[in-house]
Amino acid sequence: MSNTYQWLWKSNSNPWQTNIEEQWEKYSDIEMTIIENGYQNKYSHVELDNFIIDFKHLVQINKADSTKQRPIKRISDISLQCSREERFTLPSHNSLNTRRKSFGDEARWMSPKFIEEWIKRNPRITLTQRIEKAAQGILEEGRLLGKIVESQWLAEQLFEVKEKSWDEIALRCLFLYTRECFLYKLLNKALREEDLSKVDTLGPFCDFLWNSLSSENLKSKYQFTGLVYRSASLELDEIDAYKNSIKKNPKEWLGFSSTSKNRALAEIYDGNTLFIINVPSQSQHLDISTISNFPVEEEVLLGASTSFQIEHVKYDETTRKHHIYLRILW
């Protein structure tokens, strides 16, 4: 179900001062879900990681200091504008702790090393046990990040489908991946950096998500063929790497990649590069816009370790962006 509302908190340095321009900030996606659920169920309050939301007085109360309070408000959001730039762009150098390459050279045509390592560590495990491990792993990562309430919500969503069919579990994992929270960011960071220290906590969810893209039932409903778009801020040496690889050996993106069917949406983001990606028929990539909490984004999800051929690279004088044309191979 997509958001048709927004919850905001007043962010002025003095939130109670009058006769000034009001400044409001949105809560995170999952925080808004928790708040809206409490509002609809007429709770007196709900608890977030750092705050108590008081519905009677419409205030946010700091858990560490109850004297620190801010007004909150609920607004309808019929024409939600997509603002999740981080999801639809390749991370810049400044956002990464380590030197990164824009693509991997192996194009291994198989599941990511991250998943292979998790399977190796868990050779005989039932579907129910995998769900439990996925939920426990998310709870542990949430604890490390101080996102306990957020991770509890995610874990509860998984536990709800513990006894369901594989397809229902796959749909739930895809839905959770679309939520604006720490999960998709942390998972992709681990995949891009091939950080095997996260295998035990994120491996089971990653395995569910990766295999959901190859589910025959889901492919029959959501498989996508056509052009999709993704933005990026690339260094000149990275752009040169794409140029030098035109029509050569296949490359791969190590993480899951969110792309959009809407070119205009991808072009609004800051960045010097636009990927124009041809997704052929029979590929393992799904149009998850109707599954997503943000259908306006028109998201097509490319699986981790997606292999592609670099077809063409050019600079567009009108948009002042480098256009990199890719053809998905698998």
Regions found by a protein language model. Give the residues of each.
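Structural signal for hydrophobic/aromatic residues that build the beta-strand cores
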Residues: 7-9, 58-60, 229, 262, ...
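Intrinsically disordered, low-complexity acidic/polar segments
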Residues: 69, 238, 286, 319-320
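Internal glycine-rich, Lys/Arg-flanked active-site/core loops of soluble domains
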Residues: 133-290
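Short solvent-exposed strand/turn elements
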Residues: 318-330
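Eukaryote-biased feature marking scaffold/signaling PDZ-domain proteins and nuclear chromatin regulators
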Residues: 2-4, 22, 30, 41-43, ...
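Flexible, small-/acidic-enriched active-site or ligand-binding loops
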Residues: 282-304
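Eukaryote-biased intrinsically disordered, low-complexity acidic regions enriched in Ser/Thr/Pro
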Residues: 1-136
